[in-house]
A protein has these predicted regions:
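Short, charged/polar, Gly/Pro-enriched secondary-structure boundary elements
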Residues: 45-49, 105-108
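Core segments of cupin and vicinal oxygen chelate
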Residues: 9-48
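Vicinal oxygen chelate
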Residues: 82-123
Length: 123
């Protein structure tokens, strides 16, 4: 493997894109299809492919099913994130992090960017 290309998400409505915009993502391409809309969003080389489709079933949350548990994005400063989050904690590597959910309930981890003195401690 040489890298991660993108993360694909399904959202129920167009307005939910604003959640990802608050995290810094910007729309770079939109494809309108007869059965859904696909929006590519990018921030610092991270691409999310967002499928807007109100007809998908809701996410099963408890108990968690096998498969993807959550996605994690790195942010510059957790105190400046403009979405409602859980209490900020420290992970096993000493980095600050928190969790939030997008409007459709997709769990999102937000992790504060390493500082130069952190070095490689969370790679």
């Amino acid at each position: 493997m040489v890298g991660l290309d993108h993360i694909a998400l399904i959202v129920s409505k167009e307005e939910n894109l604003s959640f990802y915009e608050k995290l810094g993502f910007r729309e770079v391409k939109r494809i309108e299809r007869s059965y859904d809309t696909v929006v590519f969003m990018e921030d610092n080389g991270v691409i999310i492919e967002v499928f807007i489709d109100p007809n998908h079933p809701a996410r099963v949350s408890n108990p968690e099913a096998l498969g993807l548990r959550h996605i994690a994005f790195v942010v510059e400063d957790l105190s400046k994130v403009d979405v409602e989050c859980e209490e900020i904690r420290t992970d096993w590597f000493g980095r600050r992090f928190t969790f939030t959910k997008d409007p459709d309930g997709q769990p999102i981890e937000l992790k504060e960017k390493n500082t130069p003195e952190d070095g490689e401690k969370n790679r």
